[in-house]
A protein has these predicted regions:
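Positively charged, low-complexity intrinsically disordered leader regions
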Residues: 2-28
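A structural motif shared across PLP-dependent enzymes of the aminotransferase-like
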Residues: 15, 44-52
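Short, solvent-exposed amphipathic alpha-helices that sit
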Residues: 22, 49-61
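Glycine-rich phosphate/diphosphate-binding loops that line cofactor/substrate pockets in enzymes
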Residues: 25-33, 85-90
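Short beta-strand segments enriched in small/hydrophobic residues
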Residues: 33-43
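Phosphate/diphosphate ligand-binding glycine-rich loop within oxidoreductases
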Residues: 62-64, 68-139
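Conserved small/polar residues in nucleotide/adenosyl-binding loops
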Residues: 151-153
Length: 153
């Protein structure tokens, strides 16, 4: 079997181009501008970079990007209230709470509060249940990306 080198940067660039076209199509045909809300609690350096890059990529694709940076000492109830607010916000189509969250918060409770239809990580039990059952559903980004790259090569 021959070895092939996968150029992930080139693949990602082409994928972002296709996404931008799809977003423009939504805007022109349906007057919809997708919106991604990202919530970061605390100031973990790796999470800061991830959130910053996610915002840049979202905007470059022509989508609305909403960032909510909450202090480390934010209560779990306040974070859950923010998630509820985003669940009902019609301009937000997807919600990503950046993990890990501070130790005083229960990650699973936060995951379950996000509406399955807005859970871009695919971690809600409804979404992961569909995936585990072999039913069509949202696949988390990292495995989807790895699978997509490997199938094209």
């Amino acid at each position: 079997m021959a070895t092939s080198i996968i150029d992930g940067k080139d693949y990602a660039s082409r994928l972002r181009g296709k996404l931008k076209i799809a977003v423009n199509d939504l805007k022109e045909k349906h007057k919809i501008v997708p919106g991604l809300a990202v919530v970061l609690v605390g100031n973990d350096p790796a999470s800061e970079i991830y959130v910053r890059n996610k915002g840049i990529q979202t905007k470059e694709a022509g989508m609305n990007s909403f960032e909510y940076r909450l202090p480390e000492n934010t209560s779990e109830d306040d974070l859950l209230a923010k998630v509820e607010e985003l669940n009902t916000d019609k301009s937000v189509n997807g919600i990503l709470v950046q993990f890990p969250v501070p130790k005083h918060m229960e990650q699973q409770k936060i995951i379950e509060r996000i509406l399955p239809s807005k859970d871009v990580d695919g971690l809600h039990p409804v979404n992961s249940g569909y995936l585990a059952s072999g039913l069509k559903g949202l696949v988390p980004c990292t495995p989807q990306g790895a699978s997509s790259v490997s199938y094209t090569h």
